Swiss-Prot record:
PANTHER family noted in UniProt: PRION-LIKE- Q/N-RICH -DOMAIN-BEARING PROTEIN PROTEIN 44 (PTHR12974), TERMINAL NUCLEOTIDYLTRANSFERASE 5C (PTHR12974:SF34)
Pfam families per UniProt: NTP_transf_7
Descriptive protein name: Terminal nucleotidyltransferase 5C
Gene: TENT5C
Tagged with keyword Cell membrane: no
Record-level GO cellular component terms: centrosome; cytoplasm; nucleus
Catalyses which reaction(s): RNA(n) + ATP = RNA(n)-3'-adenine ribonucleotide + diphosphate
Organism taxonomic ancestry: Eukaryota, Metazoa, Chordata, Craniata, Vertebrata
Record EC number: 2.7.7.19
Entry-linked InterPro entries: TET5
Length: 391
């Protein structure tokens, strides 16, 4: 009975994609995505299909077996529900591989970098370009994680419009989602096999069976959340610090909690985790600026509303934090919001404006000069922690 129950739960997490979804998946995999080079390096014109096939082939030639390849994140959500409110930001690909030692991590990195040579324009002398040079030219982010529960690496290829191509090589990972709506993964192997073997174009009456999986556990429930813009999760204590930023992003896109009481607990968890993972103000500033750049690249007018929502959540749900440090973070968010308004040279909707300035009593003094002297931007340099343990 236990085995049957486990099988039922496993089956609930999978679903077969319909033709509309397969068609959108085909569009995502065959769309040309520019990878922008730094300096004088040329732009690479790639498709996800080509980069996956190239990297997979080279990995297996190097002795690293790829168990499967999956489309993850907002791109997978876009395939399942076209107008879901999340858009299609980074193009996340997951390669399931074994990474038992440092040698495999290094080999994976070298294979990906060398694969980029295939996409350089004709006429470029590839013999003089080393993997290190390619990394400096085209890699936005390079991450390696090795812990008791997580063994994975990430190579993010640069796109100036925020649509980075992210190649993630996973041996093990404890948690692969934050909310039900971002828990989807689409297994690409059957479609990749179709591209390799079929002489006929893909069509409604001639296409492979493609399987999607929800890491949330219940595919239909998560799919309903995505269709109806609902916020739900499981084991919120496992969500890392970036979950607070993702949660605020969902709110600004008109997603709403499935359970208001549970969400209040979730907000407290996420705020606490944010301050644990990003303990000083400089780290918080870098994280926020990077998040805005990556997730609002083509949505400048949403940045202010996003920061106001984030500020409200931090203000209302932060616990285990010294008052001064809490105010410091709130001031940081406020300054970023004001900078956004200055950059856009716009006046926000008055109903959404929050005033952070009240004239001091001495301003009414007749001898007070209101002449403003410009100073360099305020920077935060305190390296001390901004959180206290809960007792």
């Amino acid at each position: 009975m236990a085995e049957e129950s486990s099988c039922t739960r496993d089956c609930m997490s999978f679903s077969v994609l319909n033709w509309d979804q397969v068609s959108r998946l085909h569009e995502v995999l065959t769309e040309v995505v520019p990878i922008h080079g730094r300096g004088n390096f040329p732009t690479l014109e790639i498709t996800l299909k080509d980069i996956v096939q190239t990297v997979r082939s080279r990995l297996e030639e190097a002795g690293i077996k790829v168990q499967d390849v999956r489309l993850n994140g907002s791109a997978a959500g876009h395939v399942l529900v076209k107008d879901n409110g999340l858009g299609c930001k980074d193009l996340d690909l997951i390669f399931h591989v074994a990474l038992p030692t440092e040698a495999e991590f290094q080999l994976v990195r070298d294979v990906v970098l060398c694969s980029l040579l295939n996409f350089l324009p004709e006429g470029v002398n590839k013999l003089k370009i080393s993997p290190v040079t390619l990394k400096e030219a085209y890699v936005q982010k390079l991450v390696k994680v090795c812990t008791d529960t997580d063994r994975w690496s990430l190579i993010s290829l640069s796109n100036k419009n925020g649509k980075n191509v992210e190649l993630k090589f996973v041996d093990s990972i404890r948690r692969q989602f934050e909310f039900s709506v971002d828990s989807f993964q689409i297994i690409l192997d059957s479609l990749l096999f179709f591209y390799d073997c079929s002489n006929n174009p893909i069509s409604e009456h001639f296409h492979p069976t493609v399987i999607g999986e929800s890491m949330y556990g219940d595919f239909e429930e998560a799919f309903d959340h995505l269709q109806n813009r609902l916020i739900a999760t499981k084991n919120p204590e496992e969500i890392r610090g970036g979950g607070l930023l993702k949660y605020s992003n969902l709110l600004v896109r008109d997603f709403r909690p499935t359970d208001q009481e549970e969400i209040e607990t979730l907000e407290r968890y996420m705020c606490s985790r944010f301050f644990i993972d990003f303990p000083d103000i400089l780290e918080q500033q870098r994280k926020l600026e990077t998040y805005l750049q990556n997730h609002f690249a083509e949505e400048e007018r949403s940045k202010y509303d996003y920061l106001m929502i984030l500020r409200r959540v931090v203000n209302e749900s932060t616990v285990c934090l010294m008052g001064h440090e809490r105010r410091q973070t709130l001031n940081l968010i406020s300054l970023l919001a004001l900078r956004v308004l200055a950059e856009q040279n716009i006046i926000p909707n008055a109903t959404n404006v929050t005033c952070y300035y009240q004239p001091a009593p001495y301003v009414s003094d007749g001898n007070f000069s209101n002449y403003y002297v410009a100073h360099p931007p305020v920077t935060y340099s305190q390296p001390y922690p901004t959180w206290l343990p809960c007792n």
